[in-house]
């Protein structure tokens, strides 16, 4: 992509309404535009990152055996009355009526709808286990939307729902999602810690929030710092095997949100030098809620003996759009964003330091064509901005690699390769720059 033809509305000044780093940088980098309180238009740069994150979430859900579908944003109020949650949910749920006076709601979550879909088609235990997920926009009418995508009213979520014949099978499904979440966040360059948490309006008696430690987080958390050193399962993890050892390894180390924190146990089990009491950002939460919805909504299957029983369920959410904010909070410096390569909008930026000069134009065009041909996402800054402005833009938007092409280096047959993560620079031949970025 040539920057001269791209839509990248960089802001020179920090908007006054932006309170935290991620919100400030997303606005300054031209990733978002606020259209109403807590509601944003996703501009091209932000949309590219959003799609990268969404794809990682999708790949890890598929790897764990979940099956993708897509449910509508609008739901019938009667479904929620059937489960008993319509009146219990509160003012965060946007309730509307169509021209025929039918009561609808803009879904904040999908337990009722997925249960209705399940009960319409699945009648036997032989169709289990089953895990269905979708990635869809949600709306919750937050009283005080703030912090950009961290606490917006409209947001993109991945929601998965598991269906099993009994509690033992349902807990195995829970474990699969637990491991899938560890892998998902690690692939994005995040250390997300699973912490015991309240189940809230979803219900049930087992839940973990996945928390990224950050001083700007909305949650107070307590944990043993040893949890930061635990290994994340690799691609070869067997989701059909026994995942209990992995779960025990992660849950035996103390980690809890404020709602379920046990002060005496924390003091007793965690050495003073490993105690962490800080804040964190919730990027995902998983629940086992047993037969709460299946009993209320008559989602029954015939067991091996032919007797109908309510299925045991779980739900598993990832805040896809919120993850952008969490990643920026964890990966930035005074100059801008430092995207992990897996989610960066572009892998590399070519900076023509003397636009219009025949030798630099030719070298940049050669690099651009070769990288595009090899499938590298590359942004070519072919604008007539001065070099300092190009450096500032590339640092602000956080592209992992910058290729600096100037007359002085070309005279020696080299370009400068800069790594955004640590600021390191190296002079390399053009062919070597291409080779590095296509490894």
Swiss-Prot record:
SUPFAM superfamilies, sorted: Class II aaRS ABD-related, Class II aaRS and biotin synthetases
Compartment(s): Cytoplasm
Source domain of life: Bacteria
Alphabetized, the UniProt keywords read: Aminoacyl-tRNA synthetase, ATP-binding, Cytoplasm, Ligase, Nucleotide-binding, Protein biosynthesis
- Tell me the Gene3D superfamilies matching this sequence: Anticodon-binding domain, Bira Bifunctional Protein, Domain 2
CDD domains, per the entry: ProRS_anticodon_short (cd00861), ProRS_core_prok (cd00779)
**Pfam assignment, any one:** tRNA-synt_2b
Q: Which reaction does it catalyse?
A: tRNA(Pro) + L-proline + ATP = L-prolyl-tRNA(Pro) + AMP + diphosphate
Gene Ontology CC entries for this record: cytosol
Q: Identify the main location.
A: cytoplasm
Task: Kindly list the cysteine pairs connected by disulfide bridges.
Answer: none
Report a single Gene Ontology molecular function: proline-tRNA ligase activity
User: Looking at the keywords, is Cytoplasm present?
Assistant: yes
Family matches, as InterPro entries: aa-tRNA-synt_IIb, aa-tRNA-synth_II, aa-tRNA-synth_II/BPL/LPL, Anticodon-bd, Anticodon-bd_dom_sf, Pro-tRNA-ligase_IIa, Pro-tRNA-synth_IIa_bac-type, Pro-tRNA_synthetase
What Gene Ontology terms for biological process does this UniProt record contain? prolyl-tRNA aminoacylation
Q: What is its EC number?
A: 6.1.1.15
- The residue ranges crossing the membrane are none
Family statement drawn from the similarity comment of this UniProt entry: Belongs to the class-II aminoacyl-tRNA synthetase family. ProS type 2 subfamily.
Subunit (UniProt): Homodimer.
Please give the HAMAP family that the UniProt record associates with this protein: Pro_tRNA_synth_type2
Briefly state the protein's biological role.
Catalyzes the attachment of proline to tRNA(Pro) in a two-step reaction: proline is first activated by ATP to form Pro-AMP and then transferred to the acceptor end of tRNA(Pro).
Q: Which NCBIfam families match?
A: PRK12325.1 (NF008979), proS_fam_II (TIGR00409)
- Its protein name is Proline--tRNA ligase
């Amino acid at each position: 992509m040539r920057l001269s033809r791209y839509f990248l509305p960089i802001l020179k000044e920090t908007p006054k309404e932006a309170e935290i780093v991620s919100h400030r940088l997303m606005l300054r980098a031209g990733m978002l535009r606020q259209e109403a309180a807590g509601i944003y238009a996703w501009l091209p740069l932000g949309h590219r990152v959003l799609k990268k994150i969404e794809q990682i979430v999708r790949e890890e859900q598929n790897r764990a055996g979940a099956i993708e579908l897509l449910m509508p944003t609008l739901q019938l109020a009667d479904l929620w009355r059937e489960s008993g949650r319509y009146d219990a949910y509160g003012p965060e749920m946007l309730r509307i009526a169509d021209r025929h006076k039918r009561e609808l709601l803009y879904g904040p979550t999908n337990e009722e709808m997925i249960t209705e879909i399940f009960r319409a088609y699945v009648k036997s235990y032989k169709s289990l286990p089953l895990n269905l997920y979708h990635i869809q926009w949600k709306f919750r009418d937050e009283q005080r939307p703030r912090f950009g995508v961290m606490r917006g009213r409209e947001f993109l979520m991945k929601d998965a729902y598991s269906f099993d014949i009994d509690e033992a099978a349902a807990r195995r499904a829970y474990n699969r999602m637990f491991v899938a979440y560890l892998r998902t966040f690690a692939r994005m360059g995040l250390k997300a810690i699973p912490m015991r948490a309240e189940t809230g309006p979803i219900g049930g008696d087992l839940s973990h929030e996945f928390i990224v430690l950050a001083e700007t987080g909305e949650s107070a958390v307590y944990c043993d710092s040893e949890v930061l050193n635990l290994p994340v399962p690799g691609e070869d993890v067997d989701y059909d095997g026994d995942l209990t050892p992995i779960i025990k390894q992660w849950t035996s180390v103390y980690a809890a949100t404020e709602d379920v924190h046990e002060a005496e146990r924390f003091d007793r089990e965690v050495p003073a030098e490993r105690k962490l009491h800080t804040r964190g950002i919730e990027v995902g939460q998983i629940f086992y809620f047993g037969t709460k919805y299946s009993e209320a909504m008559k989602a029954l299957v015939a067991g091996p003996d032919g007797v109908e029983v309510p299925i045991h369920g779980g739900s598993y959410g990832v805040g896809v759009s919120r993850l952008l904010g969490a990643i920026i909070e964890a990966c930035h410096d005074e100059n801008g964003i430092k995207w992990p390569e897996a989610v960066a909008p572009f892998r590399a930026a070519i900076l023509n330091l003397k636009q219009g000069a025949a030798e630099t134009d030719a070298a940049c065009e050669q690099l651009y064509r070769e990288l595009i041909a090899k499938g590298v996402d590359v942004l070519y800054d072919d604008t007539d901005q001065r070099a300092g402005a190009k450096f500032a833009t590339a640092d602000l938007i956080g592209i992992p690699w910058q290729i600096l092409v100037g007359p002085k280096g070309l005279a020696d047959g080299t370009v400068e390769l800069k790594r955004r993560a640590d600021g390191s620079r190296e002079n390399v031949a053009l062919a070597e720059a291409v080779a590095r970025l296509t490894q």
